[in-house]
A protein has these predicted regions:
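Transmembrane signal-anchor hairpin modules in multi-pass inner-membrane enzymes, especially those
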Residues: 1-84, 101-111, 115-118, 175-186, ...
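Transmembrane alpha-helices of multi-pass inner-membrane enzymes
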Residues: 37-43, 215-216, 349-350, 369-381, ...
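Long extracytoplasmic/lumenal interhelical loops at the membrane interface
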Residues: 270-338
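A membrane-periplasm/extracellular boundary helix in multi-pass inner-membrane enzymes
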Residues: 126, 222-273, 288-296, 304
Length: 413
């Protein structure tokens, strides 16, 4: 009997993708392993079947971007360190197109993926509420042992709960629109509501504020719900947010007082307006250091992932807080490390997504998956490292569904 690699690849990769959301919570190593297995298996399938590489404009542009990263790394001050970040970045585009291939060839994938994804998120949300209400989650992690008494849920000591939920919630809701399940609207609204509340109690302020902003856009554009339902839901959500903030001293201090104190550098007993900071004193120092690197090589930058090595140099040093593994903003990082050329790829992608959302008639799926990517790539908030694998795992998952929507025309009405 002839071995059917296509069937084998689809079945194994589908199973891995069902577990992928959980792997993002439990282990960065595991999620990276899953991405590598799927991308290499898909590449092997292409070679084995002697099929053409995806003839898609996004695929071609990504390859050009990747080749540029490799080339720039070869001229970086620390070639090995820079190449190590850029060379393996290629796996993400094969990961995204493997997902598209699986969706198209496994008619049960979307429903199974949605159900398992929903169960995974529900467990995470319940655990987070337990930690918030009782101080300790189901794995024994106490909020008292975390910074400012924040909530981390199943992420343990990693304070990324709010960031994770904000990045996946619109993706999950978009998959709702591709499937038909019983009580879809009730589950949709319930998942959305509890996710926003957990982002709030996590203490992750940037994800919370951007989630609220995009939620307003969502409720404005979404056509599935009557105006009355939208108004009632919005009032209930706002009331719940205000109640949560003012009933918890920890959240109130974190969301309101801490935000104000970081935005305003109060070095004396009086608050002086001329000492306003960009997000915080530390963030501003990162951005200034990155700007110095950008000015030093406007077109090509300093090389992928080189910020952490160069920020200690006298010509880029600002103050002790200015040096970090990355400048905490994707766009500023790409300007510093890849110059205007690398920056233009990401900015063009964001403007393309935003342009479609603003000027074209999108389906409910199109609206949600667009918001998912915009939240992942929003330029005006602090972010992680652009070349960080955990971060890339998240936005290339959303990217796969976005390309699928364009390819099948499900993105548009």
């Amino acid at each position: 009997m002839k071995f059917d690699y296509k069937k084998y690849f689809i079945n194994v990769s589908s199973f891995i993708l069902y577990l992928f959301p959980a792997s993002l919570i439990l282990s960065t190593f595991l999620s990276n392993l899953f991405v590598t297995i799927i991308s290499l298996s898909f590449l092997f399938y292409i070679i084995l079947r002697k099929t053409k590489l995806p003839e898609n404009i996004f695929f071609k542009l990504f390859i050009i971007f990747w080749l540029y990263l490799i080339l720039r790394s070869l001229f970086a001050e620390n070639i090995f360190f820079s190449v190590r970040s850029s060379f393996f970045y290629i796996r993400y585009i094969f990961f995204s197109f493997a997902i598209i291939f699986i969706i198209e060839n496994n008619k049960y994938f979307l429903k199974n993926f949605l159900k398992i994804f929903l169960v995974t998120l529900s467990i995470l949300l319940i655990d987070s509420f337990i930690q918030f209400l009782f101080g300790t989650n189901i794995t024994g992690i106490s909020a008292k042992n975390l910074e400012d008494g924040r909530i981390s849920g199943l992420f343990g000591k990693e304070l990324v709960l709010g960031s994770f939920i904000s990045k996946i919630i619109f993706l999950l809701l978009s998959v709702f629109c591709l499937t038909k399940i019983n009580y879809q609207k009730s589950i949709f609204l319930g998942t959305f509501f509890f996710s926003v509340i957990v982002v709030l109690i996590s203490g992750d302020r940037s994800p919370f504020f951007i989630t609220i902003l995009l939620s307003l856009i969502l409720l404005t554009l979404l056509k599935s719900f009557k105006l009355k339902t939208k108004i009632i839901f919005s009032l209930f959500l706002v009331s719940s947010i205000l109640f949560t903030i003012y009933s918890s001293q920890v959240i109130r201090d974190r969301v309101i007082k801490h935000t104000a104190s970081q935005l305003i550098n109060d070095s004396s007993s009086e608050i002086k307006i001329h000492k306003l900071n960009i997000f915080s004193k530390g963030h501003e120092a990162h951005y200034i250091a990155a700007y110095k690197m950008f000015k030093d090589n406007i077109i090509f930058g300093q090389g992928p992932n080189m910020f952490r090595l160069l920020c200690k140099k006298n010509e880029y040093y600002v103050e002790p807080q200015s040096c970090s593994t990355h400048p905490h903003n994707y766009y500023i990082q790409l300007l510093a490390e890849t110059g205007l050329i690398g920056f233009s790829f990401l900015m063009a992608l964001f403007l393309f997504i935003a342009g479609n959302l603003l000027f074209k008639k999108l389906s409910n799926f199109g609206i949600l998956i667009s918001l998912s990517l915009m939240l992942n790539l929003f330029p005006l908030i602090p972010t992680g490292n652009f070349f960080n694998s955990w971060v890339a795992n998240l936005y290339f998952l959303s990217f796969a569904f976005y390309i699928y929507g364009i390819k099948t025309k499900l993105l548009f009405k």
